[in-house]
């Protein structure tokens, strides 16, 4: 099983996804201060003198100590996350496409003063991107089907893992903004 474990800081804010090995290390070093969710895996160790085998149970969500940063969260803008945010839909024609047939479109083109930021990029099929060219949607007489948004930390962790477990999804989705919709 290759399930990832959701790592939180001590305030309960998601930080990253962990492998089973990373989670086991945190548990053994007693760095997990609390956990949630079901056991996703058991790691069996050796036997002690009394013949008792050690078992390490990995929960689906772990919280660790450390500093809690209050900075504004700035998720990395990569096509794989952008396409997942927009559900592989072209936000001009509404068609659903494979990743290889999608591209990143700047609503306000870079040449027109636009920036490569979450709130200025959408998923577009190659046909619509070529049709829009180096113009705004208004100039190209094309309608944008959704408003681009910056995913919060909870949404970004969802976007960055294709195999979110049910209890992890319950935890993350409770803090999703109204912008993101889960299929």
Residue locations for each model-derived region?
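Short helix-coil boundary/hinge micro-motifs
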Residues: 1-74, 79, 142-183
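Short alpha-helical basic/polar micro-motif
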Residues: 10, 123-126
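Glycine-rich, histidine-containing beta strand-loop boundary motifs that form or position
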Residues: 18, 93-96
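Histidine-centered nuclease catalytic patch
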Residues: 75, 82, 95-123, 132-148
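Short aromatic-cysteine micro-motif
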Residues: 79-87
């Amino acid at each position: 099983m290759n399930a990832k474990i959701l790592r939180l800081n001590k305030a309960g804010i998601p930080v990253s996804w962990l492998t089973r090995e990373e989670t086991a290390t945190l548990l053994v070093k007693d760095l997990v201060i609390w956990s949630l969710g079901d056991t996703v895996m058991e790691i069996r160790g050796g036997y002690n003198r009394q013949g008792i085998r050690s078992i390490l149970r990995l929960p689906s969500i772990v919280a660790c100590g450390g500093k809690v940063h209050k900075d504004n969260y700035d998720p990395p803008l990569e096509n794989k996350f952008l396409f997942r945010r927009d559900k592989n839909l072209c936000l001009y024609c509404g068609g659903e496409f494979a990743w290889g047939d999608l591209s990143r479109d700047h609503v306000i083109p870079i040449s027109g003063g636009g920036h490569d930021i979450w709130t200025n990029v959408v998923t577009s099929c190659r046909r619509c991107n070529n049709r829009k060219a180096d113009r705004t949607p208004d100039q190209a007489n094309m309608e944008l089907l959704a408003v681009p948004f910056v995913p919060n930390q909870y949404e970004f962790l969802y976007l960055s893992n294709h195999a979110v477990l049910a209890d992890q999804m319950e935890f993350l989705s409770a803090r999703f903004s109204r912008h993101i919709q889960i299929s």
